Amino acid sequence: MQTHRAGPGYRRRSPVETTNVALPTGDRLQIPTGAETLRFKGYLIMSRNSSHDYADFADLVDTMAPETAAAVLAGMDRYYSCQAPGRQWMATQLVGRLADPQPSDLGDQSPGADAQAKWEEVRRRCLSVAVAMLEEAR
């Protein structure tokens, strides 16, 4: 089994997109937008390549349609650039990671039918976004 290594390093090209939320106390809180949160999760998959990042991504994607996630992630290159010369665009690399998630720490997880079933669900959600990203690119 081939294991994807963590990414070469990415640089943020633009400020973080935020929105303001009013708390019940009357205070206001500035938080990343939903799209920005999804981009953060994609960035973490590319930079750390951990099973936890894939699981968090899958949980977030479960709250939206894969096509919605794909539309956001297809524009990753406007927000992040790869620091290593000659590397593919981040969105292209992310499609590959999502299509075949192979986190660097996968062997560290406890074996068992329940853990395997959970991981297969994570893989399924990631793949659905990768396919939708390819459709978006057409």
Regions found by a protein language model. Give the residues of each.
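Compositionally biased terminal segments of proteins
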Residues: 1-138
